[in-house]
Amino acid sequence: MQQMTPRKAAVLSLNSSIKNGKYTNLELDAAIKKYGFEDKDKAFFTRLFYGTVERKITLDYIIKRLSSVKFEKIEPLVLCILETGLYQVFFMDKVPDSAACNESTELVKTICPKAYAGYVNGIMRSAVREKQTILDEIAHLAGSFGLSVKYSVPEWLCKMWQADYGESREIVKALSRVKVGVALRVNTLKISAEELLSHIPKELEAKCVGKTSIVIPRSCIVTELYGYDEGLFFVQDPASTIVSSLVNKNSVGTDKPFVVDTCSCPGGKSFSMAINLGNEAEIHSMDLHENRLRLVRSGAERLGITCIATHECDGRKPLTEYFGRADAVVCDVPCSGLGVIAKKPDIRYKTYAEIEKLPEVQYDILEASKNYLKDGGFIIYSTCTLRKAENENVVQKFLDNNKDFELCPTGIFGDETGMVTFLPHKTGTDGFFAAKLIRKK
């Protein structure tokens, strides 16, 4: 039986991810577990797999330029072989061009009809010969199409960011490269960030961000870090931690506040708020799916948080027994996720049609969630996307239809408007949005 190689595994995993619509991180984890690679091969496989996903638009541009066959007619497995092969040529300096060509050609013979071997070999050798010419050509591509090809982000997305924020290039550059590290939200009920940092291996190059977060830029296994089993931290980007900090002892103004988290899974914001409130609150964490709520309960148990109750509930159909009781409501609504494509590279390949109707769902959840609030209470509306249609526009529509609500300054990055956008090239965080809406007394 032929041994599984990192190159072959990358091709098969890419094809499986596309064919089955599986998230790339899940596909990667499954492959690593299945094939049991040693560290060196695992690192090569991970780089090749994620890198090819990250650079797919760029690689497909090169294939279209060199192929004698129409792009749409290239067999899926052959396309994956070409993409991984060209990624090695253009983006993996330590891989000899000859190895990339030969291995790609041999790979065709093992998993595709052998007739394709000459076709793949021809494209690979043409790419090596014309490498610098192709790179120069891509560097000189202009406008939104040029941005799309250079950074492998869909052209419609480049155009939208330019229209929404006026700085498409900076956003695209910040979000186009896959992040391999992780951010931890420290459970300050049990330990300080500085003390936890002292237990993290120096080679991971971890650093504290504020008093509650630790950022680790290196790849690591979170469950093997010091303090995981003891509940000393959980995974949460600093942007989400900052937004969660808007619900604290001072902002709610009561000893045991009543808080509703309408779209809570996997639980990060509920955990953060519980810690902010000293585990002395009544937090109701809701989600549409019971199997996801199990993550909230198990996470709370690991962290030693006892003030969270979970409820299976559609955010658009609020639980009437809690109407008029909440001091604070958090609506971290389902969104397009365009602010986190550096962590989840497959998100960038969503089509506009896939996200077009999200603002309707988001507005319905926000509109329903207002019923939980008491007079003087506030709503935090948030997303992990960079798209005004899902952010400012939803909030403005809500304000237009609910005159008993008004924006309240968040104070985040000096915000005085009540709405704040985390642009990753400026904040160093995920792309994020938050608004604070207070119900008038």
Give the ranges of each region predicted by the language model.
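S-adenosylmethionine
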Residues: M1-K441
